[in-house]
From Swiss-Prot:
Pfam families: Baculo_E56. Glycans are attached at residue 125. The keyword Transmembrane applies. It comes from Heliothis zea nuclear polyhedrosis virus. Keywords: Glycoprotein, Late protein, Membrane, Transmembrane, Transmembrane helix, Viral envelope protein, Virion. It is a multi-pass membrane protein. Structural protein that is specific for occlusion-derived virus (ODV) envelopes but not of budded virus (BV). One of its GO terms (cellular component) is viral envelope. This is Occlusion-derived virus envelope protein E56. It comes from the Viruses. The gene is odv-e56.
Length: 175
């Protein structure tokens, strides 16, 4: 499901917020993967803009590298002077618009806490750096193995001492 969730979404809260119905706002989504539209509920209309020409111009001049988001006019918390800001005050209570960024492999690595393995200072890059000597390439792996072996050794010592201690004498019960 990676890369399938990105876009501008209209959310309607139901049953006091217990349920939420969401649909994709096609014209506010500037990077749209048309191959995944079958997996997404597309809104039949925009809740704030009725004019189709105005809707079609929302993403006009969009530049992904500069804007660093896949949506326009979809974030009520953005700077009001930015292209991402939307005023949701005309919407009914329990209704909102939000931008959901696509989920990619980098996000998955970060969520799993494996980001220390990547990057210039990451374990994988250090072990595959072509300008390093063989020892420098193997050093991170040796350190990790050393730590694992140390933990196993300490566990062995603790368990061995516990097994060598005699059991405590039975308690005398006065009846």
């Amino acid at each position: 499901a990676l890369r399938r969730t990105g876009g501008s979404y209209y959310h309607i809260g139901l049953n006091g917020g217990e349920q939420v119905e969401s649909c994709l706002l096609r014209y506010r989504t500037c990077v749209l993967d048309v191959n995944n539209l079958n997996d997404v509920n597309v809104c039949p209309s925009d809740p704030l803009i009725d004019n189709i020409n105005a809707l079609q111009s929302v993403c006009h001049g969009y530049n992904a590298e500069v804007e660093r988001t896949v949506c326009r006019r979809s974030d009520p918390n953005a700077d009001p002077l930015s292209l991402q800001y939307v005023d949701i005050s005309p919407l009914a209570t329990g209704h909102t618009i939000s931008c959901i960024e696509p989920y990619d492999f980098g996000d998955l690595i970060g969520d799993l806490g494996l980001d220390g393995l990547l990057g210039e200072e990451g374990l994988l890059n250090k072990s595959s750096d072509k300008s390093s000597t063989s020892f420098q390439k193997l050093l991170p792996i040796i350190v990790v193995l050393g730590i694992v072996l140390l933990i196993i050794f300490i566990g062995y010592i603790v368990i061995k001492r516990m097994l060598m201690q005699p059991p405590p004498p039975p308690a005398n019960y006065n009846r």
